[in-house]
Amino acid sequence: NVISNVTHHSPSYFGYCHWFDLKDVVAWSLPSFNQNILGILEMQRCYLNTQSQKNLVLNQASEVFNKGTIAKLDDILTPHHLGVKEQDIVEPNKSTDKLIVFNHRPDTYKDFGNFMKVLEDIRQQRQDFTVWIPLLEKSDKSWITTEKFNKQRYYKKLQQCRVGFSPKQVYGGWSVSTTDGIMNGCPYIMYDADYYQELNPTADFFSENSTAINLLNKYLDDKDYRNQMSVKSQQYLKENLIYKDEIKKMSDYINDLIKQQKHIQSDVTEKLISIIKLKGQVTKKELFGSYLGWGRGINFGPYRRALLRNKNIYDTIDSTPHYCWIE
């Protein structure tokens, strides 16, 4: 609103939204979901983390907005998977400890209580393993460690882990914790949901605690199988989730968006060029007011783009914006 109402500019908008106040997730009394959607509807594109998350947003938005608006929102919302840097993918460690990692937030929306139940059930069968929960403040259980490290030592610790656990989550978002583990050679068993299928469809999935327990036991006991799944998971990461490839897709879209923007070559444009060339430097306020007598209702964007196509005209970044003529 500010750009449209108090400037002469009419840019194209695209954005990224990591968080939506979904009713099944937030607990506060005044969520901002509808306001967020109204802002997104002004964009040409808005990236979010997963198709699963997009589906949740569309479902909740359909309770308020009509079908035409939902169709527009569907077109705007675009999943953008958070890839990893290729150089951060390390050779898997084949001699790992019997260490299970839960490197997610230990909260209800990450089904942490159920994870602990799975662990307790396994502990009744065996006691030859430990569990690392780095985001848990502390634990009174001797077999759970909550060690915290800087980024590099955190990665080193992940390389020692036998298997990771990716829990059911209410939000349907992307799991950076899981990709952190995979790129460091730690395979994950995952709750059978579309948001994890997007991340790594080659993983082992569970929908019941009994299956999760069986899988964890298999990874603890069968090192060869564990190592095979480590390689398999990393291969999928390399082929599908490299950061620079994901960013290139976004960059290509930005280029397409810019190409769609109009510029006006007209007598007015030539007059503007002549004024800037004659004066050498003109503030935008002078150009609009003193020389053209334009009000804020006139869309200057197409003229501005035409001016900046001139090799001698530059738009300076200053407290008072200027157009400058440089030979």
Task: Indicate residue ranges for each PLM-predicted region.
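Short beta-strand->alpha-helix junction loop in the catalytic core
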Residues: 52-53, 71-89, 137-138
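Acidic donor-binding loop of glycosyltransferase active sites
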Residues: 156-173, 186
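A short, active-site helix/loop in glycosyltransferases that binds the activated sugar's phosphate group
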Residues: 39-74
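Nucleotide-sugar-dependent
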Residues: 166-179, 190-199
